[in-house]
Amino acid sequence: MTQNYRITLLSGDGIGPEIMAVAVDVLKAVGKQLDLNFEFKEALMGGVAIDATGEPLPEESLQACRDSDAVLLAAIGGYKWDNLPRPERPETGLLALRAGLGLFANRARLLFCPHVLDASSLKREVVEGVDIMVVRELTGGIYFGQPKGIFETETGKNEGSNTMAYGESEIDRIGRVGFETAKKRQGRLCSVDKANVLDVSQLWRDRIMALAADYPEVELSHLYVDNAAMQLVRWPKQFDTIVTGNLFGDILSDAAAMLTGSIGMLPSASLGASGPGVFEPVHGSAPDIAGQDKANPLAQVLSAAMMLRYGLDEPAASDPVEKAVLKVLDWGYPTGDIMSEGMKAVGCRKWGICY
């Protein structure tokens, strides 16, 4: 019997439409093989939505996402909209999407493909075999804490402030996602905070340690965020699963992505307690190469694979997509950003055809 799924596509800006087209072709191919029918619906988000409607996330687009089984997002933002007031910029649409769908946990998987190890800035022996999952809290912390803003002081000069705040329930919720994720992987969880100077991080550490009693099979460790950043570069093999707050996770995910040689290699999944999740590459919209067929679609395709696995509970469809990505690289067909000696660089469209 054919299984039907409604997928909302948010292609967004820059290279977004190019890499989304490849991912959709891949989903159609795997759907045909496994009798899965995907009903794709395009919706506006980001700069293209601002140009068309004046809003980075129109209500119509948010409702389309709510009505779907999963949301596949490509990339948003670009130079064109950088000078808009902050509340009107494309990136605010992403925050609104997460809040509107109740997404509180982001999983970003850092997996080193053996065929492109030489593209990494680190030595092969340092990165070979690395497989890290970063679990990041999405709806709290300094991005959402109040009060925040730019205020005029008594001296007549402006002062900017943001508030980093987490409640016990928020920490417990993301902490359990971290422990459950580690339990299904290698059983090691590293909690990243800044408990030596931040009160909010001390509460974070206290709650994570309290949760550990419910997961005796998981080995728990703690690192301050500055040390964690250093350790990711020094010896990434020590990590299995990392759980951390919104700001720290945002920074560490991007830093870790470049260890692969390109930020175009890192997929992510944003999930809530129920309802559709959002699946997207960690990278941005790369407006400098948009429309030139230079974009790396791997993270978008791997995000589609994460959608199949975590959003639609179709691991039998996710597995062949992930294996096919490795196979195309094994054939020696990378995009230019992960090119190594002996390989032949291909464009975004050609890479999709190779798949």
UniProtKB/Swiss-Prot annotation:
Enzyme Commission code: 1.1.1.85
SMART domains annotated for this entry? Iso_dh
**Which Pfam families does the protein's record reference?**
Iso_dh
Q: Which GO biological-process labels does this protein carry?
A: L-leucine biosynthetic process
Kindly state what the record says about how the cofactor is bound.
Answer: Binds 1 Mg(2+) or Mn(2+) ion per subunit.
Quote the record's binding site residues for substrate. 98, 136, 226
Example GO molecular function term? 3-isopropylmalate dehydrogenase activity
Residue sites binding NAD(+) per the record? 78-91, 284-296
Keyword Transferase applies: no
Location in the cell? Cytoplasm
Query: What's in the GO CC field?
Result: cytosol
What this protein catalyses is: (2R,3S)-3-isopropylmalate + NAD(+) = 4-methyl-2-oxopentanoate + CO2 + NADH
- Which pathway does the database say it acts in? Amino-acid biosynthesis; L-leucine biosynthesis; L-leucine from 3-methyl-2-oxobutanoate: step 3/4
**Matches recorded under InterPro entries:** IsoCit/isopropylmalate_DH_CS, IsoPropMal-DH-like_dom, Isopropylmalate_DH
Mind telling me what this protein is named?
3-isopropylmalate dehydrogenase
